[in-house]
A protein has these predicted regions:
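Acidic catalytic loop of the alpha/beta-hydrolase fold
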Residues: 66, 83-86, 117-122
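Short, conserved loop/helix-junction motifs that constitute active-site signature segments
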Residues: 103-108, 134-137
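Short beta-strand/loop motif that positions the catalytic acidic residue
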Residues: 113-115
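Active-site nucleophile elbow and catalytic-triad environment of alpha/beta-hydrolase enzymes
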Residues: 62-63, 78-103
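Short alpha-helix in the alpha/beta-hydrolase fold that links the catalytic acid
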Residues: 91-99, 110-111, 123-133
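Alpha/beta-hydrolase-fold enzymes
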Residues: 1-66
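Catalytic active-site module of serine/aspartate enzymes centered on a nucleophile-bearing elbow/loop
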Residues: 128-177
Length: 177
């Protein structure tokens, strides 16, 4: 419907599925297993063949329900498209796949690049590429791979691991003339 919708034509199912997929990819397998494992909602009752059976399903349903009413579908589409189209190499008019070379053109003096070991959306090898590129451009760069079970969401929720290196980096910047 070309992005035109009202409550009668609202893309509810698509939004719910998008949110569930997002939530699953923001977290790590270790977190899902530690949090939910294979715990059933009600182990005493025989479940429907394709009904909601596990606690993790209930959790994802609740996230999807909240998301549908709080996020505009067109905003979600534009945000998703912007992420798909972003290409640091293209924006620097450099060789099509030379990420390190493109980042070397950024005029930075200092950089801190943090990655979570369990982040599948921005894996450590990509974070290392960022650090390598910034360093090649002359930035005093520090790269840290932080061990976290939180996946992509680690930078939002694993404050005990992310705050100290950020604090140290900012303190060092304040001391630099």
């Amino acid at each position: 419907n070309q992005g035109r919708y009202d409550r009668s034509a609202y893309p509810r199912n698509g939004m719910r599925i998008a949110r569930k997929l997002g939530v699953v990819t923001y977290r790590s397998a270790m977190e899902w297993d530690g949090r939910f494992g294979r715990v059933r909602l009600n182990s005493e009752v025989a479940s429907e063949r394709f009904g909601m059976e596990f606690e993790v399903e209930s959790y994802l349903e609740a996230h999807a329900d909240r998301f549908v009413d709080q996020f505009d579908p067109n905003c979600y589409l534009y945000l998703s498209r912007a992420m798909d189209w972003f290409d640091v190499c293209q924006s620097c008019a450099r060789d099509g796949d030379d990420v390190v070379g493109a980042l070397a053109t950024f005029p930075l003096q200092n950089a801190l690049v943090l990655g979570a070991t369990t982040d599948i959306l921005f894996p450590l090898h990509q974070q290392q590429q960022i650090a390598d590129g910034l360093a090649r451009g002359g930035a005093k760069t520090r790269f840290l791979a932080l061990d976290s079970h939180q996946g992509h969401d680690a930078f939002l929720v694993d404050i005990d691991k992310f705050a100290p290196p950020i604090r140290q980096f900012l303190d060092e910047l304040r001391k630099t003339p």
